[in-house]
Regions:
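Hydrophobic alpha-helical and helix-loop surface patches within well-folded domains
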Residues: 2, 31, 198, 228-493, ...
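A surface-exposed beta-strand-loop module
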Residues: 74-133, 190-194, 524-535
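Surface-exposed beta-strand/loop patches in extracellular or lumenal glycoproteins
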Residues: 57-76, 157, 166-172, 439, ...
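Bacterial N-terminal signal peptides
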Residues: 6-14
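Extended, low-hydrophobicity, Ser/Thr/Pro/Gly-biased non-transmembrane segments
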Residues: 115-220, 243, 548, 570-579
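Long, ordered, helix-rich scaffold segments
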Residues: 481, 494-496, 509, 528-856
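N-terminal, polar/Ser/Thr-rich
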Residues: 17-55, 134-139, 159, 453-458
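Beta-strand-rich binding/interaction modules
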Residues: 78-84, 453-454, 464-542
């Protein structure tokens, strides 16, 4: 222990000796957190329309328990008139830090004052400007997660130095301004200007501080319901959606306050819909920002789309407790907030809408995404070591958003619902408006349950990868089970053995299935509880989806399931079985053409819209990635005809919508393209469905990518029809699919050289640039895209880098592309996080090549 302390002190000394380390190293953060407390920010921003920057003034108060130099974080702006406890100091910015001289600081409270400017841009900055082309209005908003607050104002930009914020904003008088707290007062200060004062916040981390400004309108203002704001050009659209959005949020507040035994922790709760917002939502304390398109659908929505919106709203709402009220100490515990927010969103919706079979939807939305990453060489543990916050962006992805909630469902099954809830209550109560780590939550669960969770946490939280669970069983001559065993192996071959609690399902032709509880803590275990039971038709090892891992059907069960799947009445079980069959395709154990044949035969009768949508997505993936050209050419006409027929004749509107999407996805031949053009021209329509702008532009994209003879005229007609701001974005996205070398060059140059292009325009166009049938055209851009990855990491928001890789690597299917990626990994000097992301994304390309070689 003494040796570790010496090492830590040496590391801290080294950080201080290097006056301005790059980013925010863990050692610097620990040193500051150990010395600094009682942080208070008083911030004034002046927002000027169309200006490339904002000006501001800051008064920062904090207490020190030991004197000496302090580093303040600030980058990409300028500072002036810096005083420290009344003494002038140099306002130099070096490597993203301002040095506060130790000679001017003292133990106890200190006061730092300065003027500053910070950049504003359409993309790539902490303060974003959006110009609404529909009415020429302007909106400015902030987005600081994980460590971009220091691009907006000087601060201690680490999650465990919480501060109280008092904000003042000067903006045009016609603008509405929203922040974490309510406005206390405002003052007219000149022609057309208003100065607004906001009340002081409770202690929050810098990444949770926020403001938005512009001609927003408050939608459906109703006492007792959360506030909802939208840009003025979308007010009418928002009015129609607002009651459902506000009502589910209001119900969620009541449910979560009772579940956590903790009232809503902030004075008010507003939601602000923002155009071009980089994420689905961001949970600023008391003021969640939402991507406008996630709330106001640009396509005809299905019932699943509406439920997914509920999940988004409840996810961000849960963060007000799990993330804002109690915050992880460092971003290596990012999963602690994201995993719980995702899990609790489903837990809450399952209680608010008990008829919706929410845990089936949890499986569909969560588990495949998690398994798809966790089986790759680029996966990470849930707990991710992040030595420097500059690398925190790479921690975001399916591991924290999908594996973490999947593991939490397993933990709730292990502990029991009551212990799980009581543990969360104890954890939140003990860390109110403070910071905590995973170990704190483990101790809370252990306290209420009396169970030791160290072995469980060691494998599930600290170890990467996942188990594959296999079942072996046999029956005697009297048709009773005489042998039943479970075994597991690490899918990465790294020797992991996980503690797994699961429920087995023994299914029979007649009569109810039998559920058997089982525990697998070693490489192999016999299940004595199954012995002597009647011989089942098939066995599935993860009934109700309590466990986490790959659960493939044994050969006997798989053969039975493929014969009887259409008659499985339990929709949750039917969904799980389809998922297991698809996993068998991805593991090259089941020929993709066999899966496609089964799916195309059974999906027309599938009345569960969410499952039908999954199956259609698998069919499209199978056609575009896993089968060879001859097989695809043979199957596509059947798929096109089926989609066209079901689009017109399915009894449910939701099904007609997903079959319309299916036709757009599988369309390849002339007849299908004619049908799409008929929908665009108005010569045809989907019964009962009003196609929305993005529906139409998606059809235009397909027609362009398929090089239809009328593509140019179709594109021009839609541009004329939809000249809105959104229409201009969709036109940009669609044109990226043009199958010409000139178009690809123009777009790629724009991606890497035009910082003014809004980030959501670029991100949405990446998939159309890499359309499934254009891999020969886009292969020359694979290496340049990989070369640009460090630039993307530096300049773009959290999820953009993953979208970049998924598009450019995911757009390829050939051994040549795989070889190029592997050679790049061999020779490129990459940061560890970027190397892992490439390994993660290239796994699908590797699988594609393997499947095509196995089933030529």
């Amino acid at each position: 222990m003494r040796f570790k302390l010496i090492l830590f002190l040496f590391a801290v000394t080294s950080v201080l000796a290097a006056a301005s380390p790059e980013g925010i190293p863990r050692e610097l953060a620990r040193e500051r957190a150990g010395r600094i407390s009682n942080v208070r920010y008083q911030l004034q921003f002046t927002l000027v329309p169309h200006a490339p920057s904002v000006s501001g003034h800051e008064e920062l108060r904090f207490s020190l328990n030991s004197a000496g130099t302090v580093l303040l974080d600030f980058r990409e702006g300028s500072a002036a008139k810096l005083t420290v406890n009344g003494t002038a100091a140099p306002a130099n910015i070096e490597n993203g830090h301002i040095t506060l001289p130790g000679s001017s600081l003292h133990t106890g409270e200190n006061l730092v004052s300065m003027d500053f400017t910070a950049p504003v841009a359409p993309a790539g900055k902490a303060i974003t400007r959006f110009e609404d082309k529909d009415d020429n209005s302007e909106y400015i908003y902030t987005l600081f997660v994980p460590m971009d607050a220091d691009m907006a104002f000087p601060c201690f930009d680490q999650p465990d130095l919480k501060g109280r914020f008092r904000l003042e904003l000067t903006a045009p008088a016609t603008w509405t301004v929203i922040s974490n707290t309510a406005a206390e007062s405002d003052l007219r200060i000149g022609p057309g200007q208003r100065h607004t004062f906001f009340s002081e916040t409770q202690p929050i981390s810098t990444y949770l501080f926020a403001f938005a400004a512009g001609p927003f309108r408050k939608v459906h203002e109703t006492p007792g319901l959360p506030g909802l704001y939208v840009r003025q050009s979308k007010f009418q659209r928002a009015e129609a959606e607002a009651p459902e959005v506000q009502e589910i949020t209001s119900q969620g507040i009541k449910y979560l306050a009772e579940f956590f035994a903790q009232p809503f922790p902030f004075p008010k709760y507003d939601m602000v819909m923002l155009p071009g917002f980089a994420y689905g939502g961001m949970e600023h304390a008391g003021a969640t920002f939402l991507r406008e398109e996630s709330i106001l659908f640009r396509t005809a929505p299905t019932h699943s789309d509406l439920l997914n919106r509920d999940i988004l709203l409840l996810h961000e709402l849960t963060h007000q407790w799990f993330g804002d009220f109690t915050t992880m100490r460092w971003f290596d515990d990012l999963w602690l907030k994201e995993g719980f927010a995702q899990y609790m969103a489903y837990e809450t919706l399952a209680s608010l809408k008990p008829s919706e079979n929410i845990w089936k939807r949890f499986y569909q939305a969560i588990k495949p995404a998690a398994y798809g990453i966790d089986s790759t060489k680029g996966t990470t543990p849930i707990y991710q070591d992040i030595p420097n916050l500059k690398d925190a962006k790479s921690a975001y992805g399916a591991i924290v958003y999908s594996k973490a909630p999947g593991i939490l469902k397993q933990l709730a099954f292990v502990l029991g619902a009551d212990n799980f809830r009581e543990g969360l209550r104890l954890y939140l109560k003990g860390h109110a408006y403070a910071n905590a780590e995973w170990s704190d939550l483990v101790h809370a669960f252990e306290h209420v349950s009396g169970k030791s969770l160290d072995p469980w946490a060691s494998m599930w939280i600290r170890h990467r990868g996942m188990p594959q669970v296999q079942v072996e069983w046999s029956c005697d001559g009297q048709d009773h089970i005489n042998h039943f065993s479970l075994s597991q192996h690490d899918v990465l071959g790294e020797g992991g053995v996980w503690p797994i609690a699961m429920q087995l399902r023994l299914s029979y032709p007649t009569g109810a299935p039998v559920a058997v509880q089982a525990q697998l803590d070693a490489e192999k275990a016999d299940v004595k509880e199954a012995l002597g039971k009647p011989c089942p038709q098939y066995v599935f090892a993860n009934d109700q989806d309590y466990a986490y891992g790959r659960f493939l059907l044994d050969s006997r069960s798989r053969a039975a399931v493929m014969e009887l799947l259409g008659s499985v009445a339990d929709i949750f079980q039917r969904t799980l079985l389809w998922g297991s069959l698809w996993d068998s395709v991805r593991e090259a154990e089941l020929a993709p053409r066999d899966f496609l044949g089964l799916a195309l035969r059974l999906v027309p009768a599938e009345q569960d819209e969410a499952l039908a949508q999954n199956l259609i997505a698998h069919v499209i993936t199978g056609l575009h990635r896993y089968v060879n050209t001859n097989t695809r050419t043979a199957i596509v006409p059947t798929a096109e005809a089926l989609a066209a027929d079901q689009m017109m004749h399915s009894p449910q509107q939701d099904l007609r919508i997903i079959w319309f999407r299916a036709l757009r996805g599988v369309a390849e031949n002339s007849a299908a393209r004619v049908q799409l053009k008929g929908l665009l021209s108005g010569q045809a329509s989907v019964p009962g469905v009003e196609l929305r702008p993005l529906d139409r532009w998606s059809m235009v994209t397909a027609i362009l990518a398929l090089n239809d003879p009328e593509a140019d005229s179709v594109y021009a007609a839609e541009q004329k029809r939809d000249s809105t701001g959104d229409g201009q974005k969709y036109a940009y996205v669609a044109a990226a699919a043009r199958p010409t070398a000139a178009a690809k060059k123009q777009y790629f140059d724009d991606y890497v050289s035009n910082p003014a292009r809004p980030e959501d325009w670029v991100e949405q166009s990446l998939a159309t640039f890499n359309y499934w049938n254009e891999s020969d055209l886009t292969l020359p851009y694979l290496k340049p895209a990989l070369d640009a990855l460090p630039q993307v990491k530096r300049q773009r928001k959290i999820f953009f880098g993953l979208a970049w890789l998924n598009a450019f690597i995911g757009g390829q299917q050939s051994p040549a592309a795989l070889a190029l990626v592997q050679e790049f990994l061999r020779i490129a000097p990459l940061d560890k996080d970027l190397r892992l992301k490439i390994l993660e994304v290239s796994d699908e390309l590797e699988r594609t090549v393997k499947i095509r070689q196995r089933y030529p």
